[in-house]
């Protein structure tokens, strides 16, 4: 059994095609069972569900309208009403940005920024794996990941990393899996990883992690 994980943060407006395609290949060609975990959607939903003080009018309105905004984004007819869509995105992004009171980690519906860590530096990615509990999504995802491991008992975990906006959280997820499920090898793949490996003279700086 292989557990395929789609990490935060990318647009949650469509299913994670990367792990779906891998799952189809593993099941159809290799006859290997696999399970899929959309940690991106789960993590964003958990952050949006948190209670927080309404420090200003905008935040208060966003909190009151949170459930309605989520229904709006899930409604296939919403693109016909751009003003509703825009208001929902602005308000939900407001709540996500306030998820970290210190302002050190800044998520929204399409991106994740860290004021002290860069997805372009391998040393910072390694630090995220070494200290997964410092990642903003750690508390959101720990229970979900543990439940998936308990249910499926995977022999391997695969993490699909396609965009820079996923990199820091993906390595925090790698660190979480290594600490909580140390007997399960982690395989890292995806478009971003492929681009790294195509660089002339590339050497894997993540040996021991993946």
At which residue positions do the language-model features occur?
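Non-catalytic, alpha-helical, charged scaffold/linker segments
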Residues: 36-108
């Amino acid at each position: 059994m292989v557990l395929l994980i789609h990490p935060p943060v990318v647009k949650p407006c469509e299913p994670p095609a990367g792990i779906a395609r891998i799952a189809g290949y593993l099941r159809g060609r290799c006859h290997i069972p696999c399970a899929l975990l959309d940690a991106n959607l789960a993590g964003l939903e958990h952050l949006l569900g948190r209670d927080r003080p309404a420090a200003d009018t905008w935040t208060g309105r966003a909190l009151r309208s949170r459930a309605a905004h989520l229904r709006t984004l899930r409604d296939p007819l919403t693109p016909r009403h751009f003003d509703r869509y825009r208001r929902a995105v602005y308000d939900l992004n407001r709540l996500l940005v306030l998820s970290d009171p210190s302002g050190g980690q800044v998520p929204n519906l399409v991106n994740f920024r860290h004021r002290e860590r860069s997805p372009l530096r391998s040393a910072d990615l390694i630090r995220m794996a070494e200290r997964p509990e410092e990642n903003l999504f750690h508390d959101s995802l720990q229970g979900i990941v543990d439940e998936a491991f308990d249910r499926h008992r995977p022999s391997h975990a695969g993490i699909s990393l396609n965009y820079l906006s996923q990199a820091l959280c993906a390595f925090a997820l790698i660190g979480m899996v290594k600490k909580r499920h140390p007997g399960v090898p982690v395989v890292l793949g995806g478009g971003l990883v492929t681009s790294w490996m195509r660089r002339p003279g590339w050497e894997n700086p993540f040996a021991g992690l993946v």
